[in-house]
C-alpha cells in the first residue's frame, strides 16, 4: 500500500512539472503588447502628410473679460489683437481641439520629435512678455504650492488638461526681466511651470528692438535673461528666443549672429531658434524649407477672417497642415512631396 502511495505521489509531481513546462503562465509584466503597424490604407484614409505646415500660435495677455466687454471684434482687447479675453482664449482652445490639433512642445518641434496620434496635427502655443495674467498667483496653499487664478492663461490650460487628457496641453512662455511681474512668487512660478509640463524661453531683458542697437547691447539683452534663468531653473529652460517686435525682421541682419551666439559676463549662450511675429504657419521640421533659427508664428487674434487672423490661417491649413502617422520615429509623406524631404536618419515611408 505504501509503495502505491509513493508511486502516485511521484506521478503527481512529475505531472505537475510536465504541465508547468508546457503551459507556462505569463504574468502581466511579461506580456508584451504588440502595436498594430499602420498600412498604406491608413495613411490614405487619414491624408497623412508629415511635410505639412505647423501652426505656432503667438499670444500675449489673457484678460479676465467676456468678449462683449471689449470694444473690438472676436475677443480682442486691443486694436491689434495682441491681448485676448479669457472667453476668446477658451474658444480658441476648443477650436484647436475640435479640429484635430494636438499640442506639442516647441522644443520638440524644432528637434523633429513630433509625437501626435495618427490623423491628428501638431500645434504649438507660445506667450510673450511674461505678463501677470499669463499665470496669476492668488496665494499659497497648505502644501506650499502656488494657487493659480483659473482665469489666467495657465489656469485655463490646466482646466483643459483635465478636460481633454489627449490634448497634450503645454506651452512655452517667453519672459523679460520682470519674469511674471509677481516678485514674491516669480521663483516659485518658474519652478512650477517647468515641473508641470511647460517651458520657459528668452524674450530679452528689456524687450529691446534689435534693429536699433549694436552687437554689444544685443548680446547683453540675450545673455542677461539666460543668466537669470540659470540662477532660477538651471538646465530646465529652453534656449529659444522670441524676438521682441519680431526684430531685427531679417535673418540676414548683422545682429542675428549675436542673438544666436551671445557672449555675456564671460559666458557663451547659444540659441537654437528665434521666433518672429507673423504671420503664417511654419514648415515641417523635415522639409528643406525649414529654418529652425528663424521661425514664423501666427498672431492669435480675430479680424473677421482677414489679415492672417486665426480664421484665415486655419482655412489655409485645411489643405496644407501637417498630419501625423502616429509614429514619432517614422516620416510618412505623399509621393508628390518627396522632393521636399531633407536627408534624415528616421525611417521614411512614401505612399
Protein language model features and the residues they cover:
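C-terminal motif of bacterial Sec signal peptides marking the signal peptidase cleavage site
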Residues: 13-15
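Short loop/turn segments at strand-loop or loop-helix junctions that form parts
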Residues: 57-62, 126-130, 176, 203-205
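Positively charged n-region of N-terminal signal peptides that target proteins for export
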Residues: 1-4
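Acidic (Asp/Glu)-rich catalytic clusters
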Residues: 157-168, 182-202, 266, 284-293
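C-terminal active-site subregion of NodB/CE4 polysaccharide deacetylases
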Residues: 26-126, 136-137, 212-351
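Bacterial signal peptide processing site
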Residues: 17-19
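A short alpha/beta connector and helix-capping loop motif
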Residues: 136-162, 171-173
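Alpha-helical scaffold elements lining the catalytic groove of polysaccharide deacetylases
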Residues: 145-156, 180-199, 205-233, 253-260
Amino acid at each position: 500500500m505504501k509503495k502505491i502511495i509513493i508511486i502516485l505521489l511521484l506521478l503527481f509531481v512529475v505531472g505537475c512539472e510536465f504541465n508547468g513546462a508546457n503551459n507556462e503562465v505569463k504574468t502581466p509584466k511579461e506580456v508584451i503588447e504588440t502595436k498594430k503597424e499602420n498600412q498604406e490604407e491608413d495613411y490614405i484614409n487619414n491624408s497623412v502628410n508629415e511635410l505639412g505646415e505647423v501652426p505656432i500660435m503667438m499670444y500675449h495677455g489673457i484678460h479676465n473679460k467676456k468678449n462683449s466687454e471689449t470694444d473690438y471684434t472676436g475677443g480682442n482687447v486691443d486694436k491689434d489683437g495682441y491681448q485676448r479675453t479669457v472667453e476668446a482664449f477658451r474658444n480658441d482652445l476648443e477650436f484647436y481641439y475640435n479640429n484635430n490639433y494636438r499640442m506639442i512642445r516647441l522644443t520638440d518641434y524644432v528637434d523633429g520629435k513630433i509625437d501626435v496620434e495618427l490623423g491628428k496635427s501638431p500645434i504649438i502655443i507660445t506667450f510673450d512678455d511674461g505678463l501677470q495674467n499669463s499665470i496669476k498667483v492668488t496665494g499659497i496653499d497648505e502644501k506650499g504650492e502656488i494657487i493659480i487664478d483659473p482665469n489666467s492663461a495657465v489656469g485655463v490650460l490646466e482646466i483643459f488638461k483635465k478636460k481633454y487628457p489627449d490634448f497634450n496641453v503645454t506651452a512655452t512662455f517667453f519672459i523679460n526681466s520682470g519674469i511674471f511681474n509677481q516678485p514674491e512668487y516669480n521663483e516659485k512660478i518658474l519652478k512650477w511651470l517647468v515641473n508641470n509640463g511647460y517651458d520657459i524661453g528668452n524674450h530679452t531683458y528689456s524687450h529691446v528692438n534689435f534693429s536699433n542697437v549694436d552687437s554689444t547691447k544685443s548680446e547683453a539683452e540675450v545673455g542677461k535673461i539666460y543668466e537669470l534663468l540659470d540662477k532660477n531653473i538651471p538646465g530646465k529652460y529652453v534656449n529659444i528666443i522670441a524676438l521682441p517686435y519680431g526684430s531685427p525682421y531679417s535673418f540676414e541682419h548683422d545682429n542675428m549672429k549675436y542673438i544666436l551666439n551671445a557672449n555675456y559676463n564671460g559666458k557663451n549662450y547659444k540659441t537654437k531658434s528665434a521666433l518672429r511675429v507673423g504671420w503664417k504657419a511654419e514648415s515641417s521640421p523635415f522639409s528643406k524649407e525649414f529654418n529652425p533659427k528663424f521661425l514664423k508664428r501666427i498672431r492669435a487674434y480675430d479680424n473677421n477672417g482677414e489679415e492672417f487672423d486665426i480664421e484665415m490661417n486655419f482655412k489655409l491649413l485645411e489643405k496644407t497642415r501637417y498630419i501625423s502617422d502616429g509614429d514619432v520615429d517614422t516620416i510618412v509623406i505623399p509621393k508628390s512631396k518627396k522632393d521636399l524631404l531633407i536627408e534624415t536618419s528616421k525611417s521614411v515611408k512614401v505612399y
